[in-house]
C-alpha cells in the first residue's frame, strides 16, 4: 500500500512536465495554455529537478520518463541559446524595434540609442501623438529623416523611421486593430528589402485568441523576389506554434539564430500593485528573410516602457553584376 502511494506521488511529480512537453511539442496550446506556453524555458529548467529526485529515489522507469521529458523540453528551448547562423556577406542594415508602452517610452533615450547603435531602420509600436512630438523634439529627424507613421491613442499606433529613402510605404491594420507601418528600403549596393513594424493582439484574454492567431497568420511570407524583415512586438514566443508557423514561411529569428534567443524582451512585470509577478519572456522579435545574413543581436533597456528594445545587424544581399 505504501509503495503504491509513493508511486502515485512520483507520478504526480512528473505529470506537469509531461503534459507541458506534449502540449509544446504537439502545438496543442488552446485557451489559457497559450499564455502559459510563453514560460516554457522556465519549465524546461525546472524539469530537470523531478528527474534528479526520482533517480535519487531509485524509481528507475519514472526517472526515465522524467529524463525524456527534460530532454524534449531542452531540445525545444536550448537551440535558441546556441545559434547556428553565420552572418555571411552583404550590406549592413541595422534594425531597432521598440514597444513604447502607450507612447510613454523616453524619447530622448530612444534617440540616443539610435545614435549609439548607428541604426538604419527604427520600427515602433504603441506609437502615440505624444510619442511623435517627443521624438521630433529629441531630434529623430536629424538621424532618420525618412518616415512613415500613424500616431494613434493608446496601443494601436505604428511608426517606421529610416536613414534611407522609402518606397511603397504604408500602414495597414490587423484584424485585432493594431496598425503596422511598412516600407521598401533600398540600401546603396544592396537589393531592396521590405521592413514592417509588427504588432499583434496580445493573447491576454480568451476573447483575443482568434485575433492573435489571425494577426500572426496574415503576416507576409518571405518568398519571391522581395526580401523581407518583420520586426516588432509579436506577443508570442518561439514556443507558440503560431509564431513557429510564421517563421517557417521563409524567416529565421535573428536572436535565436545568434544564440541570444532566450533574452527576455518583456518584463519582469509586477502587475497591478505588484501582486502578479511575471518573469521576463521573449515576445519581441526581428524575423529576417532566410536569404538575409544575421550579425550581432542585443536587447536594451528603455525608461518608461515594460519592453526592452531589440537591435540586430542584418546583412542584405548585394546587387550582383
Question: How would you label these PLM feature ranges?
Answer:
Residues 1-12, 55-64:
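N-terminal export and membrane-targeting signals
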Residues 8-54:
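Membrane-embedded alpha-helical segments of integral membrane proteins
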Residues 28-29, 59, 85:
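Transmembrane helix-loop junctions in multipass membrane proteins, especially transporters and channels
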Residues 40-70, 176-199:
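Glycine/proline-rich, flexible active-site/cofactor-binding loop segments
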Residues 56, 64-116, 133:
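N-terminal signal-anchor transmembrane helix
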Residues 95, 101-115, 124-321:
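Soluble catalytic domains of enzymes that build or remodel membrane lipids, polysaccharides, and related
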